[in-house]
Amino acid sequence: PPLPAPYPAVRVVVTGSTGAVGRRVCARLAADGHEVVGLDRRSSVPPAPGVEIRVVDLAVADLRDLLSGVDTVVHLASGVTAGDVGGNTGHDRLAVVERLLAAAGDVGVGHLVVRSSAMVYGAWPDNPVPLTEDAPVRPCPDFLFAVHRARLEEMAAAWADGHPDRVLTVLRPAVTVAEERPGGLASVVGAATSIRSDEGEPLGQFLHSDDLADAAVCAVAVRYDGPLNVAPDGWISAVVMADLGGYGHRVGSLLAAETGREPGSDLRRLIDHL
């Protein structure tokens, strides 16, 4: 169905505003006429005119003061990364989320956009292909990143439940890549191409940070209420990922031998075509 007409411009706070996605979100929101304040622990030059960047630690800052007069919060600084393994990391990040939600409720924030992950669905053999937003959230219990994101969703849902004046958008993106961090993509591709099982080789999906930023901005514009998968239409086979990564599969070795390309040199092709 068509999306509803955009709402008027509002005051928006974006956490994690200096990251690859955060900078894009801030710039696009400002271009749409919103008053944008970015919050991050790292200092940064504003990505566009009309964006104010404040250096704050969400774990200790006065969030009620920072969110006063704000209509929408886009929470991108939302927790652990897929590479984190420490047992306390997720708890610390969830404490920050709890503080943010409490402050948002106290000052009357009306719309919350949170970045979750498609990994909250879990890698289960009975998953349908493709997965839709109607699929149950059941992360693999040993995968800290996915468990954390599922808990984040639960906390955000509790914030919105029972309050008809509160709108919650939950973004569930596929693995997101950007030109600024090609090394992270290399690790993901390498790990995926090394997986084998009786069910066959894994399928991969990759999302450009531009597209995730556009999804967040669209959610703000129409005040989208509910979960939203953010992913490409199709997927990439293990053979193609090996071609792009240049390792973890004999095809990659053959390509390197026959073409002279260094392992990993074709990762740019993936980014350029997303």
Report residues per predicted region.
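N-terminal Rossmann NAD(P)H-binding glycine-rich loop of SDR-like oxidoreductase domains
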Residues: 4, 8-32
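NAD(P)H-binding glycine-rich loop region in Rossmannoid oxidoreductase-like domains
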Residues: 54-99, 103, 107
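Conserved Rossmann-fold NAD(P)-dependent oxidoreductase catalytic core, especially the SDR/UDP-sugar
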Residues: 99-145
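Active-site Tyr-X1-5-Lys
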Residues: 140-169
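Substrate-positioning beta->alpha
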Residues: 151, 181-185, 197-220, 226
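NAD(P)-dependent short-chain dehydrogenase/reductase
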Residues: 159-204
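Mid/C-terminal beta-alpha module of Rossmann-like enzyme folds, strongest
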Residues: 202-203, 213-273
